[in-house]
Amino acid sequence: MRVGNIRDLVNYAFMPRMIWIGLAGFAGTLLRYWLSGAVAKRYGETFPYGTLAVNAFGCLLAGALFYLMYERFLTSPTVRSMVFIGLLGGFTTFSSYGLQTFTLLRDGELLLALINIAASNVAGLFLVWIGYRLAGLV
């Protein structure tokens, strides 16, 4: 491929990584659909058991894979992006929140971790309410 300008270079360099991230995200989305459906079928839908199971399992996977990919086996940025942005991002974004908060705690940033916890929960619930109210105006 002949690269004519910086945009071509950027597109050429990142396209394979983006494709792998997208495929991993597709797999994560299918896993989320399957697991949340299986749990909801088993335990009912009076409580969001399926979502809770996906979020909890996603956090477990995020912690384990973070250790394995950063501490035990050094993996390439593309593989890490596939796993954390693609697979786990498609599976649950709550795992990103959990992993980022854990990293702050591990690095001794207790105040930032607490701010992240409070802001994510308060802002998240508040913005769901705002979105609900705004949609009701349409």
Stretch-by-stretch model annotation:
Residues 2-138:
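Membrane-interface helix-loop junctions in multi-pass transporters/channels
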